[in-house]
Amino acid sequence: MRSTQKYYEADAYRTEAAGRILAAEPDGCGGGKIALDGTVFYPEGGGQPADRGTLTLPDGTVLHVTDVHEQGGVIWHATDALPEAAAPGTEVQEALDWAWRFDKMQQHTGEHILSGILHQMFGAENVGFHIGTDAVRMDTSVPISAEGLREAELAANRIVWQNVPVCITYPTREELAALTYRSKKEIEGQVRIVSIPGADVCACCGTHTAATGAVGQIKILAAENYKGGVRLSIVCGERALLAAQAMRQRQADIGALLSAKPSETAHAVHRVFDEYTALKFAHFGLCSRLFEALAAQTAPGEDAIRIVPGLDPDGLHRLAVKLSEATTGLCAALTANEKGTGYCLARADGDVRALTKALNAALNGRGGGKPGICQGSCAAAPEQVERFLKENHIL
């Protein structure tokens, strides 16, 4: 079977073409895959997802292209159906989902610009790249500071604003040997070079905008340390605008909650955090006084089962420990929670693991710990747990 002619390489803005079926195979699930002699559909590869769109048969039947892959120079189009009319030799009309394609062009060209700038500024190699549904993932070979990323983001957007042409060339082996360009792997055969003046020269098989202005904007959403470098999450074009709108709305929502202007939300959050910290320390102190009072009411040797509303796991643990300092009997701190009851069992110089296991089995609980103290929760009311412990405390 002869190779498929790649119309998208010569013109990334071409959205329609007539193609002839070279081969068609069913997929066993009601759909199939169709090889064409020429295509406007980009096959998945190089970090860029496959194009989507339709193939229309001579009888008007429309097949939806859901995936595209290249195998041995032949490009196969996965379709949602494969009627008998889709036979070798049949001519079909190809039509791209342009919104899908143009988004990938914006993301891919934006990634090239930012990768080239990061390489210029920090010597960073792009060691990983994928255009995802929500964002583009980029992995760099070296760590880059937050300030460095801000500077690179600004420099990349300046290239966008200059609206310089994105040039596609196919240099000879001699020309290629004299050319400095980025490439993540050795390439056999003809090398396709994508050049962006002032930003990048890179070997690439993907689709790109004709000029950088069409990228619109490049925005870094997140950065994290990853394998000695940085993993970036970026968006370009319409995605960047939508991300900015979403961030602005979140800021407005936070401002409304805190009665603060959008420009003052950070200060307002710090204020609320300081207030929360003060209340947390005050609550800790009040709980300590309560736990001491409950322990003081406990006679040496007696069991101490206390139900206290609103305790978190740390509070349960602190109360159980405080009670066990006052008595050698069974000590239990209980509180109602969303699962039923949170508990912490303790016994000075004793072992509460068997009792904990029995409690979990009887009341659909989960938890465990060390011989002297165990903690968990169960699907029962605190009063049910209290009754079980009183009836089984000798375990």
Task: Write out the residue ranges for each language-model feature.
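A glycine- and charged-residue-rich anion-binding loop/surface
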Residues: 1-395
